[in-house]
Each structure stands twice: as C-alpha cells, then as structure tokens.
Amino acid sequence: MLRRILLACYLLLAPSLAACACETATPVDWMSSSGLPVLPVRPAHCAAVSQSPPDFNWPHRRLGDRYQLVVRSVVGVEQSVSTTSNWHMWDKPFAPGTYTWWVVANDPAGKAWRSASREFTLPPGTPVFVVPATASLLAQARARPHPRGLPQGTARAELVRVLAAEREPGWRQLLARVDADLKRGTVAEPTVDPRNQTERADQVKVIQSLWAMMNVEQTRVLEAALVAALTPNADYLAHAHRLILGLAAWNPDGPSSHASQFQVNRALAVVLAIGFDWLYDTWSADERTALLRRIGRRIGPIVSSAVGPTRDMEHNALNSVGLTNLGVVAGVAVLTAGDLPSADEWFEQAVPLYTNLLWPWGGDDGGYANGLNYAMWEVADAWWVLDSLRNATGLDLGTKPYLRNFGRMLAYFVPPGSRQGLFGDGAEQDMPHVYARYIKALALRVDSPYLAWLAAQSHGEDISNMALLVAPVTLVSGTLPPSAQNDLALLSVGWAAMHSSLPAHDRVSVYFKSSPYGSISHSHAEQNSFVLHVGAEPLLMAGGQYDWYGSPHGLGYYKQTRAHNAVTFDGGKGQAILDQGASGRIIGFQGGESLAWVEGDATLAYRGSVNRAWRRIYFFKPDLVMIEDKMSSSVPRRWEINLHAAEPLRWRDEQLEVSNGKAKGCGTVWTESGLDFEQATEPLPLSSSAGAGARWHGIFRTRGLMTELHALTVVDLACRASGRYIVKTAAQGFNVTAGAANFRLP
C-alpha cells in the first residue's frame, strides 16, 4: 500500500490533523531575515514535534537584546519567560495539542521587535524529556566523588562484570596493548609549528601530521588511564601517570596550542581532564594542582570560542568546530566542577546549551544535514561527554528524542552492509569498520529500536575500542520494528531514502538530497542530487575526494555541483558553495511497496542563475529508477546532466550502460533536442592523503542553447531491454518502453 507524506502539512514525524490546518508559508520577520548562518528556528512553523516540552531556538537579533518568549495553547493559556539567550528549555512537559509561540526582542534602547507567530503540534504520546535546573545538575556533579566520568557502585560492578564476560575479548586486546606499551616512554613534544609555514599546503601537512600523532597518543593515554582505573596494578598506574604528566608538560603556547592546532589542544584538554578524574585518588595534591592549572590553560581558548563573551555558538550553532568545542567544554566542566575555579561557570554556560542544541543539523526527525561522515565523528567526539553527564548528574541525553530519531536516520541512510556514507565531506571514504564502531557505541547509549537493529547487523569494528568497552551495560534487541517502512523522508534536512527492501543486504537504494541547510560547512552544492546503490556497491555516486577542508580540490571541484549527480549549465556552472542560503527542499514524497518517488526544488541553490530547478525521482521497485528534470532560465543555456561512476560510462546510440564490479545498470538519458556526451576521469586532489583513484565523470549536454530543459534519465538495474530504452512524450508525462515492459510517468 502506498503511503504519502503531505508536505503541505510539513509533518516531520507522525501525521497530525491539527498540523494540516496550519498555514505553512514561512513567516517573514526578524527571525527569518537575521542573516545566515543562524541558529535554526525551533519548533519549525507547522511542525509536529517529537519531544515534550519541545526545545525552543531562534536567531539572535543583536547581542545585548533581552527576549520574551511566549507560548500560547489552543485554549488561550499562555506561559512566558524573559531571557538574554536565544533558546529555552521549559522545566515541565506540555500537554498534547496545538500551540502558538512568538518572541519579543527588546533592545537596549527600549525598542521592542515582535516576531510573527509560529504554530506547532504536540501529538498524544509524545516522549517526555525534561531537563532539571542547571543549578541542580551542577550541585549533583560537585557532590559526585571522583571518578565522575565512570560508573560507580552497582553500575561499576556491572561494567567490571561485562569486561570479564561478553566484552572480555575486546578488553583482553586492550590490556595486551597496554602491556606492550609499559616500557615505551612518553611521546616527544612536537617542535614544528604550522604557524611558521609560509605555504598553505605545507601548513596543512604539519597540521595533519600533528593531528595524526595526537590521535594515536590520545588513544594510548586514555587506554592506560582506563586500565589503571579498573585494575589494581602499580605498573599500570605508574605508566598512566607518566603518560598524563608528560602531556601536561607540553607548552600550551607552542605547536600544540589552540592557535597552532586547535584539534591537538582540544584533545589535550580532554585527556588531561579525564586523566585527572579517572585517577583522582591516585594523584598527589601537587599533581592535582598542576593538572588543573594545565587543564585551565588548554580549555580557556576553547571556552572563548564556544560560550565566551561573544556567545558564538548561540549566534552560529551551525559551526562544526564550535559544536565539538561546546561538547568538550561541557564534558570538562562536569569532570572538574568544584575543583577548577572557573569550571562551575563553564558548566552553567555549556551544559544546558549543549543539551538544547546537541547536534543542530536537523529537526526532530533526527536528520543530520552535515553529512553522514561527520555524523559518525559527532558520535566519536560525544560518547565520553554523554557518559560523563549521565554518570555525574543523571542527565541521560540518550533518552532525548532527537537522538532516538537520529538512530532511525542511520538505519535508513547507512543500512546493513553499507561501506560508505552519503552527502558531504568524506562521504566517499570506504570505512565500514568506523561506521560499525560508532553505530554500536551509540546503540549502547540511545534507546532506539532502529539503531539496535542496525547495530546487530554491523560488523568489522574494533571490539577493543573504548567507546564500546565503557558503554553502559544495556540489553540491545536487534529486531527491526514491525512498523518500519522501506522508505523515509527527513524534511528538516531534505534527505530521502527509497529501498527495494530495507532489511535485505542485496537491496537497491536510491538516496536523494535537497537540503534547506544548503552547502554550508561540510555540505556540498548538491541540492536535487542523488546517489544509487546496488547492495553495498555505489553504482552512481558523488565525485571527488576529501583531502582537507578548504583545499583547492575541495573548493574547485569536490564541493561543486558538477561533482555530483545533478544539473549544471554552460561548462559546469551550478549552485553556490559554502552558502546556507543556496538551499533546496523536498516538496513531495511518496513511499510504497512497488513505487516510491521524491520531488525536490533547488531553485534557490543556483542563486538567481535559474528560474526553476525541479527534479522528481521515481523508483519502480525493485530495480528501475527514472529521474525527471525541469530547468528554466531567463538566459539561453547549454544544460548538463552529470553522472558519476567508478568505471567508465558507455554511451552508444543514445543508450547508457554503467557498472561497478558486479553491479550494472542500463538505460538512457533523454531530451527532445538530443544530447552530446563526453566523459573524463575526475581531477585528483594534490594531497596524497586522499582516497583511491578518480571516478569517471559523464556529462550529457544539450546540443543548443535553450531557456528550458525537460529531461528523463532511465537506469534499469535488471537491464531488461536488451540494450534498447525508448522514451516518448505523451499528452501528459512520458511513456517509457524497456524491452517488453512499459511504464507511464505522470
């Protein structure tokens, strides 16, 4: 049976008749015109929220303003709060129903700026997530004896038990590494400073080498600290002390400084804070003082970049580096509150904001617009913060509905058997072991049946990784929910997944993106683009390679529209990069057992170069995909349909063949005026640190200049036509002949 999401209702999750009555035009006011990037407005207008009470966010109008947030129920009951922050979390659940909310910004001169009213619906049965008062959380953290970041009492006993039972193979591997490391000395402090390099490429090489060294050393030191904390052995303890004090001796103004290599400085702050906490009772008073002093030096500039006087993360939450910094400040504050004089203030600033934002790259539906590669690194950076908050304060972010739905998102966009991510920087990297590691680490911390199902079928992870070994001891069921469909659209981020069969490893999967977040941060100029997988093999994929952020290859090709399965014109011109306003949106979606389709509008992404950029993808299950494009421009253009593959595309007599190993597709690319075809291997990045060889870039270009394009691309995974696919226009739509089969498109 076909199921349809009526986008006029802008339903992010469960359908709601109340939400369908909402006028969906985005209100035009100071909250919608504050400039980009900004803190996204939540709850979105006409949204059906998935958390009670919902998180409230809005853009800062101007630093120094005071805000009055007002929420009115459908029966006229109002509640309000005055705040200098542009976000708020209520301290009790909301009753199911429809609500209207607005914000009044009061500037220092006494002028008031009222926003338009926005509406949201809270369906019956919405999960409750109430955050205790910050003062209460801080008091609990301060009262908690060290080690706060590790479980205590019966929870600690249970952790020790599983390390000797079901997690014993991984624990044994970690112990073996630490045993082999006992006679190694401390790593030498780096002496080469990126700031002293005159060429950008040389600077990047030093930055990357410093991070590679620190990544290894961070793991080494934390493993030693964990073994020393859980095993009563003098040799382990002396080894952990030696490593931690060795890192503490590094010059915080040298090559490892925040100004020189912020990732290294951040990792040092984390290692020192965890080492201080986990081994607290084994440090002398002088050693504790020295460690706290060094933690303060390391964390100081991180605090300034996240929650300092300029309140950067409130102004621009869509800052990948700043978001990680915010989590680090929150985690370090939890571990050092009451010990480090400034830690209480950091706690009060960072913990509630981190709880509210978490990962602000999507809405309640669990979307993550910054790409799946960076979604995994969010988990890598956050697991110890989640553990520290839960163990020290009782605040369990694993019960936050967004994280539950984030788990559902992973199940649909990196389903079992996937080797690569989707969309954005690093999506092409083949690292199933990394995905398995962090999917399982998250599944042990987040109550999500979709995530549990995905974790049970993910394999190849390093079972000795700390994110897995110290995870909460929970029972994880590996059963896909009976209500699970084969298709999913996440409207908040403009992503859609359509599968022939979600549970099957040999599934055919069509992934589509047309994102309201545009091409900001690690996202690419790929609105209305798609990726096609056959089982684990990407048949039609995005192009380019991620060498380093902001590289010539990244800016000149990798992030560009022409490096994706999308439409360009006049020699590869396309959408704007590094621009949140260069956005798209899903305007139609329908899932089903035999047919699914998704429709996107990417007109804004081209920043005025086109008048219309429309694409609809039909998936005739299990193995036929058709992509319809409509483009228009005031200026005549040569339009280009770009396709990317691992092997050369074959185009003869207007018939297409594409393959990747055993995966194969046949079809055609059609326009009424005909197309010229050319292809070449893609440009490679200068950096040798990027991935494997180049992909093939096929360009189907209109033969003349025209103001409009109407095109249809057919990809048949069964190759049923024995080499012949015929497209004919009908009174309305198309008739497509594929061998003996006929398909009609509306």
Stretches with model-predicted labels:
Residues 23-62, 119-123:
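Pro/Thr/Ser/Gly-rich low-complexity, intrinsically disordered linker/stalk tracts
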Residues 26-31, 121-149, 652:
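Low-complexity, Pro/Ser/Thr- and charge-rich linker/hinge segments at domain boundaries
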Residues 91-98:
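Surface-exposed, short loops/turns at beta-strand junctions within beta-sandwich domains
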Residues 546, 550-746:
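CBM-like, beta-strand-rich accessory domains located in the C-terminal region of large
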Residues 108-124:
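Extracellular fibronectin type III
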Residues 310, 336, 374-539, 589-593, ...:
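Carbohydrate-active enzyme catalytic cores, enriched for enzymes
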Residues 156, 172-176, 191, 206-414:
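Aromatic-lined, polymer-binding surfaces characteristic
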